[in-house]
Amino acid sequence: MTVKFGYTILYVPDVRATIAFYETAFGLALRFLHESNLYAEMETGATTLAFAGEEMAEMNGLAIRPLRAGDLAQAVEIALICDDPQSSWDRAVAAGASPLSPPTAKPWGQIVGYVRDLNGSLVELCSDMTAIA
């Protein structure tokens, strides 16, 4: 049996607004948008970052706690590896991301900063750990 990590799907109140935000704030490109506007995938490399409308959770029989910018962040984050975490953090904040902590050097040598997206999801903007390991 083979298992591989394929998707992270965030259930969001507005898929199209979330796509626009991730394009502007993080420079990600849209890979796929279903005609219903309830599901989209972004170009992110080997693992797919996807957005699904909250209605999709309901359609799939899932009870979820909706993401909301004003609520305490969920205990999960999206980590985006950046060539320049500071520039990426600045771009995200200029695009409307809520700044949490600017990029700083961690004891293990990685540069890490945090923002929240328009829906309140935690987004880590970080340097690549493979350069350190």
How should each PLM-predicted stretch be described?
Residues 15, 85-86:
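Residues at or immediately preceding the N-termini of alpha-helices
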Residues 18-23, 92, 120:
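Conserved active-site tyrosine of GNAT-family acetyltransferases
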Residues 12-14, 107:
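Conserved beta-strand-loop-alpha-helix junction that forms the acyl-donor binding cleft
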